């Protein structure tokens, strides 16, 4: 009997599980509201690495003179809008590649928000209610429901993101001009990446952290 599997969330955990399940003959459906690939592909891991690769060009140019190559780089030459446009374009391309791979494996993709549906209050069932973008709802039955909703940026009560002066790591790629001074709250991997990248671009950067060192979850020597 074919197993019916519904996966809530289309990030790395969700789409990898979907691919494996489909390859083993399961009937798989992914319900996702933010885009296949999730935060990792669309807003975090892939975009940040692309962004860092851009700043790495300046790093190479600074070292060029040591190798006998005359090179001059004007920090104002950065076209941040163009840089971020490339970042977003590559992220969308990878998301599209993952979507195509899922569809080739026969995975059904639904765009909407999902929640576990209980036809009788207090009685857990293997049903999921999907609310589509147009407001319509549909209840799907499953043998297995996998919740893989991932993470979202933490918002501080007294510093709500407004997309202009206070930004989450999702909104940072909407900037079109380099800031004169960037304050990064958090010393984890994402925070450290942005500190490194914007410093290399000539921006004054201040890191604020509640921990006693950068990269608190990594090896102490590396941090």
Where are these regions (language model features)?
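N-terminal Rossmann-like FAD-binding beta1-loop-alpha1 element of flavoenzymes
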Residues: 3-30, 191-199
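Conserved N-terminal Rossmann-fold NAD(P)-binding element of oxidoreductases
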Residues: 8-9, 31, 147, 185-186
């Amino acid at each position: 009997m074919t197993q019916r599997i519904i996966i809530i969330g289309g990030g790395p955990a969700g789409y990898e599980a979907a691919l494996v399940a489909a390859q083993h003959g399961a009937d798989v459906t992914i319900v996702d509201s933010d885009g296949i690939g999730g935060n990792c592909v669309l807003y975090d891991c892939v975009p940040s690495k692309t962004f860092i690769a851009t700043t790495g060009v300046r790093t190479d140019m600074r070292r060029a003179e040591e190798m006998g190559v005359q090179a001059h780089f004007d920090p104002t030459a950065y076209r941040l809008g163009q840089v971020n446009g490339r970042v977003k374009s590559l992220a969308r391309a990878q998301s599209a590649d993952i979507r195509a791979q899922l569809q080739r494996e026969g995975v059904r993709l639904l765009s909407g928000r999902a929640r576990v549906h209980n036809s009788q209050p207090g009685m857990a069932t293997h049903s999921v209610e999907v609310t589509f973008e147009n407001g319509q709802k549909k209840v799907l039955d499953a043998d297995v429901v996998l919740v893989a909703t991932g993470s979202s940026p933490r918002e501080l009560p007294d510093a709500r993101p407004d997309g202009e002066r206070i930004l989450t790591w999702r909104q940072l790629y909407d900037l079109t001009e380099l800031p004169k001074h960037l304050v990064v709250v958090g010393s984890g991997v994402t925070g450290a990446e942005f500190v490194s990248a914007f410093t290399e671009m000539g921006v004054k950067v201040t890191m604020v952290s509640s921990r006693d060192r950068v990269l608190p979850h990594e090896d102490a020597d590396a941090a």
